[in-house]
């Protein structure tokens, strides 16, 4: 095919001034006549002609313009939440692997200890068996010697004893015969003669056999002690072996738990990746579209490729215009790739002048933030950061004066300072929020406690009021009953009651006069200009009214006051 096909994907196609050089570069990399080559940075695809070696010369000679087609590319979107969860799960898997390695190393050490204990026990077991064989042989010799001694004792006399128990038994029998039995004088003389007979040969044999028995007993004791020491060592080693085996079982259980935990995290990562792939369904669909377009470009079918590209663009634009969610998803996907390629949201290259302008502003902010942070924490580092900032600004002023405009990013030190300052601010804000939340909770708790106390106090007051009202009602009824009884019983008051009432009236009148005189002595010059109108009533009650009064019984009031006091004391005790 004479025409060249340029297949472009991305947000915007920018025509290059040196397209022939690009075609030459791409055609050198092609392997076959109809092979498709890709440039990932520029997202372009070129298809070759008949021969790869003479393609550039033919294009230069012919001067045919290449055909370009536009297809929208859906980039991969890595959800930060899913990415954070996957990173966290990977960290947990790394920790599980570290724990598994530690458990395996501990298990290896325990197994080595078990093997060493087994070797020690294997070396001690034959020694113990040899000592047991020696003990058995010694016991046989000892038994033969004891039998020989017993035979000698039986041949000579029955009175020869080799043990303390036999001697005690014989002495007991002799004492019993002396106390309860009857022995003649001849027999006693014969027993004395038998004891006084000299028998040197038999006694020497007995002494030799006794010495051999003693030596055999000492040898047996030594062998037994050695055997006991070996058995103690074997028991100690068996205890250590049992402990190490228990430790190995515990480590196996811990290893199984760690592996189970790791498998859970692997399953979680798998689910998160499936979720991420579901979110990137548009990207996989765009991959299939791109593969189909590459096949069409490789085959050289321009008409079908043009129809396919236009249909894909129309489909994308309909989705862009109709579906808001699709539009937001595409913007979210394309923003990261635009930042990497230094493009604006509309696909154009960022202006260098604006970049330099923003670069001039950013270091000043970083220096201010660094100065604030270092004033609070480090005063020395603030001066160093300010000097670095001044040097950077001077360099950037010189670069703006030069002909070639170069984009320079702020230095890492300033970025680190900004990140540290932001982290400290965030931490302070979080601490302040936590403090405010704690204060709010404390105030709410105090309010709730105060409300509960007030509520309890009100309930107690209500109970007291109810008790007092019931008591007063009861006492009023008692008074009414007493008054009715007194009115029925007494028709006229007694003389004693009249005398008491007269004395009360006199005391009241005397006290009123004394008060009036005291007030005059204290305030002699004060005179009131108001006229005092006296009432028509008398100060002292007449005798006729006094005679009409009923006699009150004071024992009723005493009982009522005592009952009220008792009820109040009971209420106070119940509240406590």
UniProtKB/Swiss-Prot annotation:
Residues 369-381 have a biased composition (Basic and acidic residues). Residues 34-63, 369-395 are annotated as: Disordered. One of its GO terms (biological process) is regulation of proton transport. Residues 132-155, 205-241, 411-467 form a coiled coil. It is found in: Cell membrane; Endoplasmic reticulum membrane. The keyword Transmembrane helix applies. It is a single-pass membrane protein. Keywords: Cell membrane, Coiled coil, Endoplasmic reticulum, Membrane, Transmembrane, Transmembrane helix. The chain crosses the membrane at residues 555-575. The keyword Membrane applies. One of its GO terms (cellular component) is plasma membrane. May regulate plasma membrane ATPase activity. Belongs to the plant Proton pump-interactor protein family. This is Proton pump-interactor 3B.
């Amino acid at each position: 095919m004479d025409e060249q096909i340029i297949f472009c994907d991305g947000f915007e196609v920018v025509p290059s001034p040196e397209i022939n050089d690009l075609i030459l570069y791409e055609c050198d990399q092609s392997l076959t006549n109809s092979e498709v080559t890709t440039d990932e940075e520029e997202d372009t695809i070129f298809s070759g002609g008949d021969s790869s070696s003479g393609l550039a010369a033919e294009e230069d000679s012919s001067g045919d313009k290449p055909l370009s087609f536009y297809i929208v590319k859906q980039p991969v979107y890595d959800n930060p939440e899913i990415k954070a969860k996957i990173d966290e799960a990977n960290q947990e898997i790394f920790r599980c692997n570290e724990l598994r390695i530690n458990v395996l190393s501990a298990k290896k050490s325990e197994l080595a200890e078990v093997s060493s204990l087994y070797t020690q026990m294997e070396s001690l077991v034959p020694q113990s068996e040899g000592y047991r064989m020696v003990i058995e042989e010694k016991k046989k010799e000892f038994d033969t010697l004891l039998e020989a001694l017993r035979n000698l004792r039986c041949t000579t006399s029955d009175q020869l004893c080799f043990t303390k128990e036999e001697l005690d038994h014989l002495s007991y029998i002799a004492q019993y015969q002396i106390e309860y039995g009857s022995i003649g004088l001849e027999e006693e003389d014969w027993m004395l003669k038998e004891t006084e007979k000299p028998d040197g040969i038999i006694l020497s044999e007995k002494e030799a056999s006794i010495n051999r028995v003693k030596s055999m007993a000492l040898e047996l004791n030594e062998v037994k002690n050695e055997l006991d020491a070996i058995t103690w060592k074997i028991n100690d080693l068996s205890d250590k072996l049992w402990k190490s085996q228990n430790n190995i079982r515990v480590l196996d259980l811990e290893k199984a738990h760690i592996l189970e935990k790791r498998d859970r995290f692997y399953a979680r990562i798998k689910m998160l990746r499936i979720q991420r792939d579901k979110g990137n369904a548009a990207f996989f669909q765009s991959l299939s579209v791109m593969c189909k377009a590459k096949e069409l470009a490789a085959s050289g079918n321009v008409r079908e490729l043009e129809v396919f590209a236009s249909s894909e663009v129309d489909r994308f634009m309909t989705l862009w215009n109709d579906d808001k969610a699709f539009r937001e998803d595409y913007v979210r996907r394309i923003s990261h790739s635009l930042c990497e390629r230094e493009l604006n949201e509309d696909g154009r290259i960022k202006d260098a002048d604006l970049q330099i302008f923003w670069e001039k502003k950013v270091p000043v902010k970083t220096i201010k933030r660094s100065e604030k942070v270092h004033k609070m924490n480090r005063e020395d580092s603030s001066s160093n950061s300010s000097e670095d900032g001044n040097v950077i600004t001077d360099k950037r002023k010189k670069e703006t004066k030069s002909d070639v405009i170069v984009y320079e990013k702020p230095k890492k030190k300033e970025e680190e300072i900004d990140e540290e300052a932001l982290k400290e601010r965030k931490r302070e804000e979080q601490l302040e929020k936590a403090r405010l939340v704690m204060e709010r909770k404390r105030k709410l708790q105090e309010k709730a406690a105060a409300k509960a106390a007030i509520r309890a106090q009100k309930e107690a007051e209500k109970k007291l009021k109810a008790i007092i009202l019931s008591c007063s009602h009861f006492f009023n009824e008692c008074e009414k009953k007493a008054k009715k009884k007194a009115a029925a019983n007494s028709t006229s008051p007694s003389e004693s009651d009249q005398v008491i009432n007269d004395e009360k009236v006199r005391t009241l009148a005397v006290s009123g006069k004394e008060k009036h005189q005291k007030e005059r002595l204290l305030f002699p010059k004060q005179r009131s200009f108001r006229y005092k109108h006296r009432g028509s009533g008398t100060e002292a009650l007449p005798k006729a009214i006094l005679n009409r009064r009923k006699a009150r019984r004071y024992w009723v009031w005493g009982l009522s006051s005592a009952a009220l006091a008792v009820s109040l004391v009971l209420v106070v005790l119940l509240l406590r």
